[in-house]
C-alpha cells in the first residue's frame, strides 16, 4: 500500500509542526529584551557576567517591580547553591546552605518556591525597612486585666 509511505516517516529529521515551533521560539527569543535591556545585557556580558537572556529579563522585570535587589541576590544565591549541590554533593558547606532558606518559604505560597520565596523575602525586607513600624511596649509596664493597681490578679477560690 503506497498510501502509507506518504508524509514524514520515522526516518525524517523533524516533523513540520516541531520545526515551526522551533522557529517561533527563535523569533520570541530574539524579541525578549528591549533595546535598553539589550544594552544592559551586553554590558553585563562585557563585565564577565555570563547569563541567559531569559534569566536576565526575569531579573530586570523583578527589579522593575520594586523587588528589593538584596532579595533578588539572595534568591539567585540559593538557586546557585542548589545547582552546586546537585552537581557536587561532596562539599559539606554547600549542603548546609539550602536548609537555611527553607523555613523562609514554608508558610507562604505553595506555588513556585524560588519565586515565592524571593517575593516573600522582598515583602519582609520592605516591611522591616519601613519607618512606620512602632516598637511594642514591654508587657511588664501594662496593668493586669483585673483593673486598678489596688486589686490583685485573679486567684483560685479555696
From Swiss-Prot:
Q: Output compositional bias ranges, type Low complexity.
A: 111-122
Carrying Phosphoserine, the residues are 34, 152
Pfam families per the UniProt record, alphabetical: MOZART2
- GO cellular component terms, semicolon-separated: centrosome; cytosol; gamma-tubulin ring complex; nucleoplasm; spindle
Q: Where is this region: Disordered?
A: 84-158
Give me the stretches of Polar residues compositional bias: 128-140
The UniProt keywords, alphabetically, are: Cytoplasm, Cytoskeleton, Phosphoprotein
> Does the keyword Transmembrane belong to this entry?
no
Cellular compartments annotated: Cytoplasm, Cytoskeleton, Microtubule organizing center, Centrosome; Cytoplasm, Cytoskeleton, Spindle
Q: How does it assemble?
A: Associates with the gamma-tubulin ring complex (gTuRC) consisting of TUBGCP2, TUBGCP3, TUBGCP4, TUBGCP5 and TUBGCP6 and gamma-tubulin TUBG1 or TUBG2; within the complex, interacts with TUBGCP2; the interaction plays a role in gTuRC activation. Interacts with TUBG1.
Give the protein's function.
Required for the recruitment and the assembly of the gamma-tubulin ring complex (gTuRC) at the centrosome. The gTuRC regulates the minus-end nucleation of alpha-beta tubulin heterodimers that grow into microtubule protafilaments, a critical step in centrosome duplication and spindle formation.
Q: Which family does it belong to?
A: Belongs to the MOZART2 family.
Please state what the protein is called. Answer: Mitotic-spindle organizing protein 2B
Gene that produces this protein: MZT2B
